């Protein structure tokens, strides 16, 4: 229902911005990005270079592309939000032919009046210097003449090239930048950057946390069939013996030393840096989370059984836009009834949610930083006896998970605490007969890092201060489950964004009601949308 309004409103906003000069002023500062690059250098090995490429432009259909989203690592280090760029960070200062010192180079897309008339203004070389504080900036077509001998470095570290990048005619684009880099770095045809990245995950994680890494590797192997033939990855992922994982770790370390091309160091450094947030980052992340919490509140007030999943999604996303969050951090999940049992349900096309529970997992992205907040509410405003029984188990599981989210605790501590509560609760209700069966109805992990990515980068080690994680237990009982039919179609997930501090966990999304009593009370509040009626269409 609200999508028509959003389309018109966004059209008006576009006209205003096209002719005006006002843009948001609360992005990360140039000093932030510069300081992050200095932190990168502190963690680099001697005589090394890190190479970061901008994200590719992605095609939606025919001649229409998706809205461009910068690679989070590239944005983190540069603040540059355009495509077709490459950043080089050197471990030590160098000199160019004019004797000028430098420790970083950035190549950006060239100013082009015709292209800018159609697609928006570009920073270009001078804008990148002025706005982002870089000194050594060049047009992308100059990268082919880069005065750097990659063979002279002990380590040339970069992320993989598995993204779909197109070769556009004319200007130097991402395709050309990557092609040039591969030629100059003697990139072998059989190099497996994703494999090297997973090797890095093995070697950079303390052996006592290797069980968690093994689980992650198992998921990667399922998603990347070309990696399934790698014996080191396969044995590590399938081993339950820490001694075996330690032996594989030593073998991986040997393999990593065979040439100067590497995907380990760059991955390890970015995992370390992005795991903990600076105060400047926390300002933006907190705003994204608060916006998302307000979205949940406004939907609670507006909810009624005749609403569609799409309409509910539209209310959330209108709130985001109203507060200046231009995008969502990930595809919005709005699942009524049995649809909520699909963990990543994004169709959101049920015409009426009826009297079911509605699971809403959404997050606003504010200036690159994304929230991830989930609430589950009864469409008719009142929890049934069965719905409340399941909800209360999940609520108490989340409380246990949040309480376990303290400095020094293992990354899996919230999940362990939450899982115990879920298992006991399901046993008490008679939904399961053995503790091991709880995994049937709670099949996912409880936490992930949060930041520039909804599943942000980190080391998966002990919790550190200024880390932001999610705590999101859930119970999902799809139709046809091996339990009493009265439980079928009930899906509950509660997800909050938690800041780890020396004084204990801080719930950044606490504004959105979590208890059944608080939710029901909020749903009785009037909504600005109560009197909003669109004309019917034939």
Locate each region found by the language model.
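Bacterial N-terminal signal peptides
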Residues: 7-17
């Amino acid at each position: 229902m609200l999508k028509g309004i959003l389309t018109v409103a966004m059209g008006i906003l576009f006209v205003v911005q096209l002719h005006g000069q006002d843009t948001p002023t609360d992005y990360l500062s140039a000093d932030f990005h510069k300081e992050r690059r200095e932190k990168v250098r502190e963690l680099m090995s001697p005589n090394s270079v890190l190479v970061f490429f901008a994200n590719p432009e992605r095609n939606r259909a025919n001649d229409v592309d998706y809205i461009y989203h910068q690679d989070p690592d590239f944005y983190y280090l540069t603040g540059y939000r355009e495509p077709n760029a490459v950043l080089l960070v050197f471990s030590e200062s160098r000199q160019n032919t004019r004797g000028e010192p430098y420790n970083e180079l950035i190549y950006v897309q060239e100013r082009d009046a015709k292209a800018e008339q159609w697609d928006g203004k570009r920073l270009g070389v001078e804008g990148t210097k002025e706005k982002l504080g870089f000194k050594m900036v060049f047009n992308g077509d100059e990268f082919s003449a880069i005065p750097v001998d990659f063979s002279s470095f002990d380590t040339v570290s970069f992320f993989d090239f598995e993204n779909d990048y197109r070769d556009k005619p004319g200007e130097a684009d991402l395709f050309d930048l990557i092609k040039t880099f591969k030629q100059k770095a003697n990139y072998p045809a059989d190099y497996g950057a994703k494999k090297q990245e997973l090797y890095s995950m093995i070697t950079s994680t303390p052996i006592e946390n290797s069980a968690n890494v093994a689980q992650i590797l198992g998921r990667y192997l399922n998603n990347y069939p070309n990696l399934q033939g790698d014996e080191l990855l396969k044995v590590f992922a399938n081993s339950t013996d820490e001694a075996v994982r330690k032996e594989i770790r030593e073998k991986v370390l040997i393999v990593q030393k065979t040439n100067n091309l590497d995907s380990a160091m760059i991955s390890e450094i970015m995992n370390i840096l992005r795991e903990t947030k600076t105060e400047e980052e926390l300002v933006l992340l907190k705003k994204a989370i608060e916006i998302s919490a307000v979205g949940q509140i406004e939907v609670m007030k507006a909810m009624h059984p005749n609403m569609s999943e799409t309409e509910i999604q539209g209310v959330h996303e209108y709130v985001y836009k109203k507060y200046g969050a231009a995008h969502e951090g990930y595809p919005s999940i709005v699942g009524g009834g049995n649809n909520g049992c699909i963990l990543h349900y994004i169709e959101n096309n049920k015409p009426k949610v009826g009297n079911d529970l509605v699971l809403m997992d959404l997050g606003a992205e504010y200036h690159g930083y994304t929230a991830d907040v989930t609430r589950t509410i009864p469409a008719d405003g009142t929890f049934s006896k069965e719905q409340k029984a399941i909800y209360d188990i999940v609520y108490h599981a989340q409380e246990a998970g949040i309480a376990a989210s303290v400095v020094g605790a293992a990354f899996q501590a919230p999940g362990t605490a939450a899982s115990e509560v879920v298992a006991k609760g399901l046993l008490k209700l008679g939904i399961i007969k053995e503790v091991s069966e709880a995994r049937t109805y709670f099949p996912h992990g409880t936490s992930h890092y949060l930041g520039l990515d909804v599943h942000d980068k980190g080391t998966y080690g002990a919790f550190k201060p200024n880390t932001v994680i999610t705590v999101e237990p859930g119970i999902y009982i799809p139709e046809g489950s091996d339990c009493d039919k009265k439980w079928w179609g009930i899906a509950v997930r509660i997800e909050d964004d938690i800041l780890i501090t020396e004084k204990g966990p801080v719930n950044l999304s606490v504004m959105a009601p979590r208890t059944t009593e608080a939710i029901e009370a909020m749903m009785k509040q009037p909504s600005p949308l109560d009197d909003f009626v669109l004309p019917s269409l034939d």
